[in-house]
């Protein structure tokens, strides 16, 4: 099964999306958006940019845990990964976003 996006609304009324792999694991999380349409535009940006390796910023957090950001052509962060135990597992996470990011399936959980 291929991955999908989920749009949800936080208690403060803001929206975010996540990209899930086929196994249901969250592989990318967006920032918070004031408007649902902005979150939908963020999904479109992931769909457009996820297959381009140059759009991935490979980082290491202060706690020495590797993670990555996916950036748009304008260098704005579209989504951020979880923290990984190793650079190898982070790189597998990037491959998962590349494989699942182009999916057109969006589950709207905002009710």
Curated annotation (Swiss-Prot):
SUPFAM superfamilies: YegP-like. It comes from the Bacteria. InterPro entries: DUF1508, UPF0339_domain, YegP-like_sf. The keyword Repeat applies. Pfam families: DUF1508. The keyword Repeat applies. Residues 89-111 are annotated as: Disordered. Gene3D superfamilies: 2.30.29.80. Keywords: Repeat. Sequence repeats lie at residues 10-58, 61-109. Disulfide bonds: none annotated. Belongs to the UPF0339 family. Duplicated subfamily. This is UPF0339 protein ACIAD0721. It comes from Acinetobacter baylyi (strain ATCC 33305 / BD413 / ADP1).
């Amino acid at each position: 099964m291929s991955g999908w996006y989920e749009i949800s609304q936080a208690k403060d009324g803001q929206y975010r999306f996540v990209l899930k792999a086929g196994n249901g694991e969250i592989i990318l999380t967006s920032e918070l958006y004031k408007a649902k349409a902005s979150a939908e535009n963020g999904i479109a940006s992931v769909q457009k940019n996820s297959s381009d390796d140059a759009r991935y910023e490979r980082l290491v957090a202060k706690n020495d845990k590797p993670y990555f950001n996916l950036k748009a052509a304008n260098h704005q962060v579209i989504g951020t990964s979880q923290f990984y135990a190793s650079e190898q597992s982070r790189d597998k996470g990037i491959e998962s976003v590349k494989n699942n990011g182009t999916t057109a399936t969006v589950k709207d959980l905002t009710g």
